[in-house]
């Protein structure tokens, strides 16, 4: 497989696994190599964890590394193992440069959750979602309730994304990109939506 441009999250000091047995310091031009056997699991010393898109890195952070104040690095590496579309592993990874971290709003996290759940959702839920996305079904009380529940919904969405990532028609990068726009759901899933 050819070398790919990938993305890695570190803590605010450019480190991963702070204080652990796999503690690593990253920076521009730094390469690390996995020490475990190549047949080991992705989340182990056998593979160095990376992402194929910066938005996926940020959206998956709470259920993966859960780094506080993360930094985002562009990287180079050869993908040798995948967890669906959620993350990938390289035997060697080189961080190239520090990038601006995408800032994801609560509403964008909810849109990501919607995009992940849409393919398997009921028609009544899809109708409600179409109205929510268009702004038709957002009273002040609903907005307050949504804000209170949004973080939990986003966490559930990330878990749902993990479960659906192996589904053949699922494009996690397209969903993440769509979530940061105000485009209607039909641009992501071109099917008729009846509001």
Tell me the role of every PLM-derived stretch.
Residues 1-195:
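Short, glycine-biased loop/turn motifs at secondary-structure junctions and
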């Amino acid at each position: 497989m050819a070398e790919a441009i990938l993305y890695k999250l570190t803590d605010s000091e450019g480190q991963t696994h702070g204080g652990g047995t796999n503690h690593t310091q990253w920076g521009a031009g730094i390469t690390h190599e996995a020490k475990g056997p190549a047949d080991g699991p992705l989340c182990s010393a056998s593979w160095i964890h990376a992402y194929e898109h910066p938005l996926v890195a940020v959206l998956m952070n709470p259920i993966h590394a859960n780094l506080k104040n993360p930094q985002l690095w562009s990287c180079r590496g050869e993908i040798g193992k995948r967890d669906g579309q959620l993350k990938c592993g390289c035997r060697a990874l080189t961080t190239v440069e520090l990038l601006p971290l995408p800032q994801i709003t609560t509403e964008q996290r909810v849109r990501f959750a919607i995009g992940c759940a849409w393919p398997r959702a009921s028609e009544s839920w899809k109708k409600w979602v179409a109205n929510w996305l268009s702004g038709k079904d957002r009273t002040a009380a609903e907005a307050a309730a949504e804000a209170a529940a949004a973080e939990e919904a986003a966490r559930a969405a990330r878990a749902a994304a993990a479960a659906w990532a192996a589904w053949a028609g699922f494009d996690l990068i397209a969903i993440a990109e769509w979530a940061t726009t105000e485009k209607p759901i039909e641009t992501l899933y071109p099917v008729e939506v009846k509001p």
